[in-house]
Amino acid sequence: RKGNAKLLFIAHREEILKPSIACLRQGLTDPNFGQLAVGNYHAARSEHLFMSIQTFNSQKFWEKMDPFYYDMIIVDEFHHAAAKGYQKLLNWFHPKILLGLTATPERMDGKNILNYFGGHMAAEIRIRDDIERRLLCRLHNFCIDDPVSLSNIKWTGGHYDIEELENVYTGEGALASQRARAIIQALERYTADMRDVKALGFCVSKKHAHFMADYFNRQGIKALALDADSPKDVRNAARQKLESGDITIIFVVDLFNEGVDIPAVNTVLFLRPTNSMTIFLQQLGRGLRLFPEKDCLTVLDFVAQANRKYDFASRYASLLGKNHVVIKKEIQDGFPHVPKGCSIQLEEIAARHVLENINSRLRKNEFYMDMVKELASATGHIPTLEEFFKATAIHPHTFYNEKH
C-alpha cells in the first residue's frame, strides 16, 4: 500500500493476468496499480508488473533487471514452474517472498515443485475442503455408460492414442452418432431444465469438438466448438453467448483447462478419457466457481470399457482424499463420504467397468512388472523411476502409498 515494495506477477495467459491485476487493484483500492506486459500491452514501468512468461522470455527481461529488484514475485499456475521456460525467472531473481499458486501441485512426471519452497507448502486447501467451506459450489457427479469401448484402442506412453480416439468418436459409421445421441440423452436425463444449462464439453481433438457441436446443432441444441487456435475475439464472443444463454454448450479442446473463470458454467461433460489428474481437476474446476444463479455443478463423466492401464480411481480419490483400496469400497457402498451436499452416482454398467479397472490395478505386482517390461521393450533399457512415472502417468504418491 505504501508503494515501496516491488511486485512481479507471472502467468502464462493474458486471461489470467487481467483478472489478477483487477483483483489487486480492488484489494488495494488503487485503480492505477500495476501495468500489464502481455500481448499488445507494453508496460512503461516495472515496479508493479503483471507479465506473461512468454513476454518475460522473448524480451529476455532478466537481462534488464537486478536479481534483487523485486520484493515479491507471484507465479500463478505454479505447477508449470518445472518447465524449461520458467528456469530463467526462478534462477535469476532472489525476491524476499516467492509465492507460487496452483490448484494442482502434484505433477504427473514426478518433478517436485516444492523444492523452490524448502520442501513444504505454506498453505494448502484441497477441492474437498473448498466445497465443504462453500468456497466452491457443490457438485453432483454422474458416471454414465459410454457405448464406445476403448479396450482395443492403442495405448502408449501412459495414454490412449489420440488419432484412434478421434476416429472412434467421429467416424462415419453408426457408432459415433450413437455416442453423440447418448450424450444428449444423458444431458436431458441428469439436468433439471435444458434451457438453464450452461455447459463445457471437453473433447479429444478439434475434429471431435466440431463433430459434437455440429451434431448438437442438428438436434436443435445451440452449440459452438473452440480450440486453443480460435482467435481471442471468437473465444470472448462464445463465452458471452454461453453466459447470456444464447448457446447451451461449448465443446473445447486444449482450452479452458486452467486459469480462465466462467462462473456461470453449471454443467461439465468429460467426453474423452484423461489419465492426468492435473488436467482432470483443472477441467472440473471450470464449473466449480460460485455464481448467484448456480446451486450446484452437474458433472457428466462418460465411462467406457477401458484399457486396464487406465486409472479411473484417481479422479474419485482426488475428491474424497482416499486411496484406491478405499475407493473400491466407496463405490460399492454408494460413496457415503463425499463432501456434504454432493453426490457421485455410477450407472450399473459404468460401475462395473470402474470396479474391473480398479481390481486390475490393485494387483500391483503384476501390473507394475507388465508396465516395466513394456517400457523396457519400447526404449531398449529398464526405465528409471522418473522415466516410469512420466511414461505411465502414475503419481509417485500413488506408487508409494498403496499396498503392492
Summary of predicted features, one role per range:
Residues 18, 34-42, 61, 210-214, ...:
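Conserved helicase ATPase core of P-loop NTP-dependent helicases/translocases
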Residues 179, 189, 312-404:
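Long, largely alpha-helical accessory region at the distal end of helicase-like NTP-driven motors
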Residues 123-200:
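Conserved interdomain linker/interface between the two RecA-like ATPase lobes of SF2 helicase motors
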Residues 7, 14-38:
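Conserved helix-turn-beta segment of the N-terminal RecA-like "Helicase ATP-binding" lobe
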